[in-house]
């Protein structure tokens, strides 16, 4: 289940190996030289977090979100990234030796500063800046309605730092659902969602639940 509150970390030279940090909202955490080897960070948010000179050896990051994160000189050797977003992330001196990437998106992130970063082009999308996305008026209205929900507003998963609709989030949603379904689903979510969450994956999970139960 998603954590209901921010689980902000402040570790310095700590040992936190083989831990389960699934669904943790780690926004604005500040960690230095901490060993997280073998830990599970699936569905975790690193929004505005600083994890400098940390060790993430063989950690998993499924549907994790690194937004404006500072990962300077951290090690992600043999880490597994799947359905993960890196937006405006500091990768200066970050070591990705042996890391695996599948369906990963990099936006406004300087990859040239990272070390040993290797991936197949089919598994990664790279955008130098936030892309423009043309959507229908009906979908735009549904997204704006959803963003009026206090928990969606707090999560920041549908908007940019300027408060505009996040084209990457919309792109991901349209990869998972047809537009007509997405419009109706977002309208339902705007009324139904009543808990804290921290990544887009939670909205996708709710929409898939509606789909499975034939509610739309």
Per-region residue spans from a language model:
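Tandem repeat scaffolds
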Residues: 1-145
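Terminal module of membrane-associated proteins
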Residues: 122-216
